[in-house]
Swiss-Prot record:
Organism ancestry: Bacteria, Pseudomonadati, Gemmatimonadota, Gemmatimonadia, Gemmatimonadales
Localization: Cytoplasm
Family as reported in the entry's similarity comment: Belongs to the class-II aminoacyl-tRNA synthetase family. Type-1 seryl-tRNA synthetase subfamily.
This protein's UniProt keywords: Aminoacyl-tRNA synthetase, ATP-binding, Cytoplasm, Ligase, Nucleotide-binding, Protein biosynthesis
Function (record text): Catalyzes the attachment of serine to tRNA(Ser). Is also able to aminoacylate tRNA(Sec) with serine, to form the misacylated tRNA L-seryl-tRNA(Sec), which will be further converted into selenocysteinyl-tRNA(Sec).
Protein name: Serine--tRNA ligase
Assembly behavior: Homodimer. The tRNA molecule binds across the dimer.
Catalytic activity: tRNA(Ser) + L-serine + ATP = L-seryl-tRNA(Ser) + AMP + diphosphate + H(+); tRNA(Sec) + L-serine + ATP = L-seryl-tRNA(Sec) + AMP + diphosphate + H(+)
Major location (coarse): cytoplasm
Length: 425
């Protein structure tokens, strides 16, 4: 959520941010209505202050007349009328306040200055690592290879839960566990993250705090009677760990990692490639979350991204890092890097991580603050997160990129101690 002072004093900054995202046409009316409501709020406050001053004066005059033994009936009636006007003005002010706050929830974050303008076609490759394997007919797509190896059971996953749900069996289940342990060990032992194990269901306040609600409520799986929601990512519960709390500056940066299942209805995914593990409703992921001092948050983003890249290097998967254009940057993010691996069996680059800086956008919604020094006024932290990494597409890439001429699949050296073997055959 934005600082309401932007709306009051720097509306042009908000308009420019929405323009860079390609959202000005869509959200221009929201800004116009918010500006109108803010003007109405200011008018109500001005009138309210005038009426409060008048009431105070009338109250004093009533006291003086009574003290002098004079009739104050007319003044008392006037005071009551003023009180009714004050009540009405307070209601107008409160209604305008609530409406403006609701509209602020509809506005995405403002992209940082170095984020390129445009849609996804303007995403910029900032670096690459490794050499992607050239697709050829001998490389079996991961869905066929996984089923042939007895690792994936797509049909029974669909029978149990519907399309987009996967059953991992035998070595497939072991591979998921191996990936989890390897990633968590690297992030906790090498990168200094605190491991957390968080609930898979959260309340509305948590989803609102990270920016998932109200904008993307249709994408969430809901437990309606309890008003709880399955998490789309561990970002939601981990970011909300310190909701409505004040940290000391010395505690920053705070670093958390968490493994979790993730649930997404993908309501807007019709027509996209959903074969195999490419687009599913439930998947596993290790998430990194940071609370940072605003002065160092850009450096924190670069560090977090490099830590996600470490996993891809250990898995020996060639990848590229994209700086997302403003129109492709997520709702809450001010700057995002996507990590993509190449899957030669399907001939596509697959996103396996998004590493984002949210500035104080989430912190304002969740009221997460820090105190710069003793006695100073609390300020909002900057939040960051990144997938490190999402398992389903990683498994797809492993099965395709490390596929051998004899049909076996080589297990990367760093993963072998966790998986217990060097080859899948």
């Amino acid at each position: 959520m934005h600082d309401i002072r932007l709306l009051r004093d720097q509306l042009d900054v908000l308009r420019e941010g929405m323009r860079r995202r390609g959202k000005l046409t869509e959200l221009g009316d929201v800004l116009d209505r918010a500006e109108s409501l803010e003007q109405a709020r200011r008018t109500a406050i001005t009138e309210l202050e005038a009426q409060q001053a008048r009431r105070n004066k009338v109250t004093q005059e009533v006291a003086q007349r009574r003290k002098a033994g004079e009739d104050a009936t007319a003044l008392i009636a006037e005071g009551r009328a003023i009180g009714e006007q004050i009540t009405a003005l307070e209601q107008r002010r409160n209604e305008a306040d609530a409406a403006v706050q609701a509209m602020l929830y509809e506005l995405p974050n403002i992209p940082l200055a170095d984020v390129p303008e445009g849609d996804e076609t303007a995403n910029t490759v900032v670096r690459t690592w490794g050499t992607p394997r050239t697709p050829d007919a001998s490389i079996v797509p991961h869905w066929d290879k996984g089923e042939a190896l007895g690792m994936l059971d797509l049909a029974r996953g669909a029978k149990i839960s519907g399309s987009g749900f996967i059953v991992y069996r035998n070595r497939g289940a072991r591979l998921v566990r191996a990936l989890m342990n390897m990633m968590l060990d690297i992030h906790t032992e090498e990168h200094g993250y605190e491991e957390t194990w968080v609930p898979l269901v959260v309340n509305r306040a948590s989803m609102t705090g990270t920016g998932n609600f109200p904008k993307f409520e249709e994408d969430a799986y809901a437990i309606t009677e309890d008003e709880l929601f399955l998490i789309p990512t561990a970002e939601v519960p981990v970011t909300n760990l310190y909701r409505d709390e004040i940290l000391d500056a010395e505690e920053l940066p705070k670093r958390f990692c968490a493994f979790s299942a993730c649930f997404r209805r993908e309501a807007g995914a019709a027509g996209k490639d959903t074969r195999g593990l490419l687009r599913v409703h439930e998947f596993d992921k290790v998430e990194l979350v940071r609370y940072a001092n605003p002065e160092t948050s850009l450096e924190e983003l670069e560090l977090l991204t490099s830590q996600a890249e470490t996993i891809l290097k250990r898995l020996e998967l060639p990848y590229r890092v994209l700086l997302l254009a403003a129109g492709d940057t997520g709702f809450s993010s001010a700057k995002t890097y996507d990590l993509e691996v190449f899957a030669p069996g399907v001939g596509k680059w697959l996103e396996v991580s998004s590493c984002s800086l949210f500035t104080d956008f989430q912190a304002r919604r969740a009221n997460i603050r820090y105190r710069p020094a003793a006695g100073e006024k609390p300020r909002f932290v900057h939040t960051l997160n990144g997938s490190a990494l999402a398992f389903s597409r990683i498994i797809a890439s492993l099965l395709e990129h490390h596929q051998q001429p004899d049909g076996s699949v080589r297990i990367p050296e760093a993963l072998q101690p966790y998986f217990g073997r060097a080859v899948l055959a």
